[in-house]
UniProtKB/Swiss-Prot annotation:
One of its GO terms (molecular function) is translation release factor activity, codon specific. The modification N5-methylglutamine is found at Q235. Peptide chain release factor 1 directs the termination of translation in response to the peptide chain termination codons UAG and UAA. SMART domains: PCRF. This is Peptide chain release factor 1.
Length: 360
């Protein structure tokens, strides 16, 4: 284990002793607000300190097993214990590194996933549809729920733009690194000469704000339009102006929803998306300022960043931020996205760990 990590963990162990003492004091116990605050910190510190205690125990076990290697009667058992202890120490160190990393407070939230067709005309819209299906299928394997909030269909299939709401545990934390430019290289169905075309889509992943996070929108700053919904929806569709579009006049940010059966429901969902987009704009501006100070591999999540290429003739997916190349493109497009997301998570954790080390 790196010295700076051990030093941080020793501080956690010391802090746990301090918190145990504080929680035993009568003046703390009689002040409920202070008691709750200290109890929350105690729970967080206990998780780290407990794993570190286990790590030190396995280090001691490993040292003891190595001493037994010189005893012929104990050597076989010692080798088994060494293998088991070394494997557990690797796992524990990985867990401890994660526990020490600063957490994004939005990680556990639901997310809005916005996919827009870019350069490439009809082929780009078809690819936007492919991406929407890929994320929907991955969500199903993760046990998440997906609903389409709004969709602008293309004449030959696919989407000019589609907004999905993905609900489940840890959705934003898992999908946040999908924001950016996605490029596809393939022979379009409409191509008669067999030439490979390059098209692009942009993806934006935004955490769904909760009631405490939600910004207050001044009604005077909003323009609300109603229109007839289009797309799937049975006989109800196009008979009433149930779809809602909301424009935030100060920023020009627009959100719409046509999935619900009532104008009231669509307005509520459109306002949720609008709040998320306004907050994402503020977040992107902050990230751009931070990126000017330090450039991370995984990137800022700006939709102008080209993050990934999907090459169908080669069956290849390449994520340019971490130089990851996988030759299992068809499986990935069917929702087998876990390996990509896990690699991005590990890369981001390595960045954060390096920042911790340089600050230590």
């Amino acid at each position: 284990m790196k010295p700076f990590l051990r030093s941080q963990l020793e501080r956690y162990a010391q802090r746990l002793e301090e918190l145990d003492f504080l929680l035993s004091r009568e003046d703390i116990m009689s002040d409920m607000a202070q008691y709750r605050t200290i109890s929350r910190e105690h729970a967080e510190v206990t998780q780290v300190a407990g794993r570190y205690t286990r790590y030190r125990q396995r280090e001691a076990d490993l040292a003891g097993a190595r001493e037994m290697l010189d005893d012929p009667d104990m050597a076989d058992m010692a080798r088994e214990e060494i293998a088991a202890a070394e494997a557990e120490l690797v796992q524990l160190e990985d867990e401890l590194q994660r526990l020490l990393l600063p957490r994004d407070p939005d990680e556990a939230r639901n997310a809005f996933l916005e996919i827009r067709a870019g350069t490439g005309g009809d082929e780009s819209a078809l690819f936007a549809g492919d991406l929407a299906r890929m994320y929907t299928r991955y969500a199903a394997t993760a046990g998440w729920k997906v609903e389409i909030l709004s969709a602008s269909d293309n004449e030959i299939g696919g989407y000019k733009e589609v907004v999905l709401r993905v609900e489940g545990d840890g959705v934003y934390g898992a999908l946040r690194f999908e924001s950016g430019g996605h490029r596809v290289q393939r022979v379009p169905a409409t191509e008669t000469q067999g030439r490979i075309h390059t098209s692009a889509c942009t993806v934006a992943v935004m955490p769904e704000p909760d009631e405490q996070q939600a910004i207050t929108l001044n009604p005077a700053d909003l323009r609300i339009d109603t229109f007839r919904a289009s797309g799937a929806g049975g006989q109800h569709i196009n008979k009433t102006d149930s779809a809602v579009r909301v424009v935030h006049l100060p920023t020009g940010i627009v959100a719409e929803c046509q999935d619900g059966r009532s104008q009231h429901s669509n307005k509520a969902k459109a306002l949720q998306v609008l709040q998320a987009r306004i907050q994402e704009k503020e977040r992107s501006e902050r990230a751009a300022k931070e990126a000017a100070l330090r450039k991370g591999l995984v990137g800022s999540g700006d939709r102008s960043d080209r993050i990934r290429t999907y090459n169908f003739p080669q069956g290849r997916l390449t994520d340019h931020r971490i130089n990851l190349t996988l030759y299992k493109l068809l499986a990935i497009m069917e929702g087998d996205l876990g390996e990509v997301l896990e690699a991005l998570r590990h890369a981001r954790e390595a960045e954060l760990l390096a920042e911790l080390e340089s600050a230590a």
